[in-house]
Regions:
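Short acidic/glycine-rich loops and adjacent helix/strand connectors
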Residues: 1-127
């Protein structure tokens, strides 16, 4: 049964939650540790600004690049703090823009870096 780590960060911007479990994608056969790592106030502030400005930002915006790097670091810390081997990480990243009526959504988070620094392949870009 695949060992997985699920990561969650929401628009509350309070931090990243992580949970380890064994599942085939339909049935959970074992639950492991879980944790929350709160974002520092500066990252929380910067993410709020990005949420407010997202519709006018470009991918190369320095504020966005900086926030994405810091946000990814929190996700890496969460995976490593669980101290459990995993075969897969569920990583939806941080939503900064969601306009379903316009078929538009944007998440930030560096899945390639998450894979490199944890040694575990993430399932990303789920939207």
């Amino acid at each position: 049964m695949p060992r997985t780590i699920g990561l969650m960060s929401g628009t509350s911007l309070d931090g990243v939650d992580a949970a380890w479990l064994e599942t085939d994608g339909e049935t959970v056969t074992a639950f492991g540790p879980s944790l929350s790592i709160p974002y520092d106030p500066a990252l929380r502030r910067d993410l709020r600004v990005i949420l407010d400005l997202a519709s006018g930002l470009t991918q190369g915006d320095a504020r966005l690049v900086s926030a994405e790097a810091r946000l990814t670091e929190y996700h890496i810390q969460a995976v490593n703090a669980l101290e459990r081997p995993a075969d897969l990480i569920g990583f939806h990243a941080q939503t900064i823009l969601h306009q379903p009526d316009r078929r538009r959504t944007w998440q930030i988070g560096d899945a390639a870096r998450l894979a490199r620094e944890t040694g575990v392949a993430p399932q990303a870009e789920q939207r």
